[in-house]
Amino acid sequence: MTSSSTPRMHTYKRTSSPRSPTNTGELFTPAHEENVRFIHDTWLCVLRDIKCPQNHERNDRGPQEYVEKNPNPNLHSFIPVDLSDLKKRNTQDSKKS
């Protein structure tokens, strides 16, 4: 690894380091893609197991859905963001400009 590719440290604070050019698009390594695929597949299994709890009747070690006992009133109007949809919109907006 060359010194230009490593982040520089100064009194325990990260300073600017060389960044990848932003105009090249997103490039992912095979390891990154494998990790994303693993997380995605595992999450689908968890969702399936939550919807079909009979698979875990004999075993209490299955996934458990967490529900707040006292929901925060400030989050009552919270609407989750679909990150893939947001990325698509941002990509389309950047192509228009």
Swiss-Prot record:
The alphabetized UniProt keywords are: Cytoplasm, Nucleus
Species: Danio rerio
Q: TM spans, by residue?
A: none
Q: Which family does it belong to?
A: Belongs to the MCRIP family.
Principal place of residence: nucleus
Location of this chain's protein in the cell = Nucleus; Cytoplasm, Stress granule
Query: What is the name listed in the Swiss-Prot or TrEMBL entry for this protein?
Result: Mapk-regulated corepressor-interacting protein 1
One of the GO BP terms on file: regulation of epithelial to mesenchymal transition
Q: Where do the record's region annotations for Disordered lie?
A: 1-27, 54-97
Q: Name one Pfam family in it.
A: FAM195
Polar residues: compositionally biased ranges: 1-26
Q: Per its UniProt record, what InterPro entries does this chain match?
A: MCRIP
| Assigned GO CC terms | cytoplasm; cytoplasmic stress granule; nucleus
Cited function = May play a role in the regulation of the epithelial-mesenchymal transition.
Composition bias of kind Basic and acidic residues appears in: 54-68, 84-97
Short motif (PXDLS motif): ranges: 80-84
